[in-house]
Regions:
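Basic/aromatic-rich interaction segments and small domains that mediate binding to polyanionic partners
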Residues: 2, 7-75, 89, 93-96
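Intrinsically disordered, low-complexity linker and terminal regions at domain boundaries
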Residues: 78-81
Length: 96
């Protein structure tokens, strides 16, 4: 891997749906911020927040290639919308 263009405090978006992330409640399209200055084994430690004062969805290491920078900042409301869509989808499929 070459020199990274990401750094601590950068806002990022998860661009893949990955089972290991999904187990932690993190899905493609969710946004967060890098909370550690170190990229360890090609992974950044990312906080995926909810909107307002709610508890974070997750803090987990995410592969750099699974992230894209959000230079304009992030919007935690998107994370809640995605969580809601996943919940509804899970409910629909569990009925059948």
């Amino acid at each position: 891997m070459g020199v990274s263009n990401m750094k601590e405090m950068d806002c990022v978006e998860v661009i893949v749906e990955d089972d290991s992330y999904a187990k932690e409640g993190v899905h493609q399209g969710m946004q967060g911020w890098i909370c550690d200055s170190r990229c360890i084994n090609g992974r950044w430690l990312v906080i995926i927040p909810q909107y307002g004062e709610k508890e974070n969805i997750a803090t987990l290491p995410i592969k750099e290639e699974d992230l894209v920078l959000l230079p304009g900042g992030m919007d935690a409301r998107i994370n809640e919308r995605i969580r809601g869509m996943i919940f509804i989808s899970d409910c629909i499929y569990s009925v059948h």
